[in-house]
């Protein structure tokens, strides 16, 4: 699994995942499934934010080629991938600037168009189960939740999927590719252990609390990219490099 992760994810994503695990005293060489899961989550967060800007009229637009116009503002602030101290500094700055309520837990992104924090989830299980876990943990309707699965399903707070269908399809395609590549290497079954999932489901169901007022809907429609964190946004050369990395697995 470790070899797969290093072959199929951008080196910057791998480095961020290693740092995140070491921050919590975890070893990527031992907890390889977690290593793969963290890399996948990081990539989805970066892909979620890619190419999305806000123009001078406050409208959300997509710019995929070349350097964006200087008048454009990046729609999403990336919080995931930073060390905890820096991440909370970014969150506090956003709250002080926008007046939004400070979340109890570190979110993954901030959406400047909708003025809300976003929690991204990537699950190997049923999307509605994972959604409930996230909602029960966060216990706040102010943080928007968006869950993706490796099967092309998704679920979001109040069925508001934030992104256009093409952007979401790009994420779903990448997740499906990761699943196929794991399966071709005989890694998928160990990544999704039925016994482990069953035990976790029983534990989750025992600890669940009602999520009143959270309207959800599952989308079953199945229809690259990485921003640097400092500086935050990617130039066209880096985008092209990541596109090549994105296609690496498919070419094997």
Curated annotation (Swiss-Prot):
Single Gene Ontology MF annotation: RNA binding
Main localization, broad class: host cell
Gene Ontology BP, a term: viral RNA genome replication
Active site, UniProt feature: 80, 108
Domain notes: The probable endonuclease active site in the N-terminus and the basic amino acid cluster in the C-terminus are important for the shutoff activity. The C-terminus acts as a nuclear localization signal. The C-terminus is recruited to host protein complexes involved in nuclear Pol II RNA processing.
Role played: Plays a major role in the shutoff of the host protein expression by cleaving mRNAs probably via an endonuclease activity. This host shutoff allows the virus to escape from the host antiviral response. Hijacks host RNA splicing machinery to selectively target host RNAs containing introns for destruction. This may explain the preferential degradation of RNAs that have undergone co- or post-transcriptional processing.
Protein name as it appears in the record: Protein PA-X
């Amino acid at each position: 699994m470790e070899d797969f992760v290093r072959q199929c994810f951008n080196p910057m994503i791998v480095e961020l995942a290693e740092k995140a695990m070491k921050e919590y005293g975890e070893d990527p060489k031992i907890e390889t499934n977690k290593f793969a899961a963290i890399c996948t989550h990081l990539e989805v967060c970066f892909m979620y934010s890619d190419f999305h800007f806000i123009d001078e009229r406050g409208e959300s637009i997509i710019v995929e080629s070349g350097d964006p116009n200087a008048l454009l503002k990046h729609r999403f602030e990336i919080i995931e991938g930073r060390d905890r101290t820096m991440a909370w500094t970014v969150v506090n700055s956003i709250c002080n600037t926008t007046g939004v309520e400070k979340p109890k837990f570190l979110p993954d992104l901030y959406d400047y168009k909708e003025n809300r924090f976003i929690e991204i989830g990537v699950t190997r299980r049923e999307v509605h189960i994972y959604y409930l876990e996230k909602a029960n943990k966060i216990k706040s309707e102010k943080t928007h939740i968006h869950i993706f699965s490796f099967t092309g399903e998704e679920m979001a707070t109040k069925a508001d999927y934030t992104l256009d269908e093409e952007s979401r399809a790009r994420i779903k395609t990448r997740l499906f590719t990761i699943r196929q590549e794991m399966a071709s290497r005989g890694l998928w079954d160990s990544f999704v252990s039925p016994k482990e999932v069953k035990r976790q489901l029983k534990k989750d169901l025992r600890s669940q609390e009602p999520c009143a007022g959270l309207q959800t809907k599952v989308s079953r429609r199945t229809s690259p990219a990485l921003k640097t964190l400092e500086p935050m946004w990617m130039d066209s050369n880096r985008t092209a490099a990541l596109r090549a990395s994105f296609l690496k697995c498919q070419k094997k």
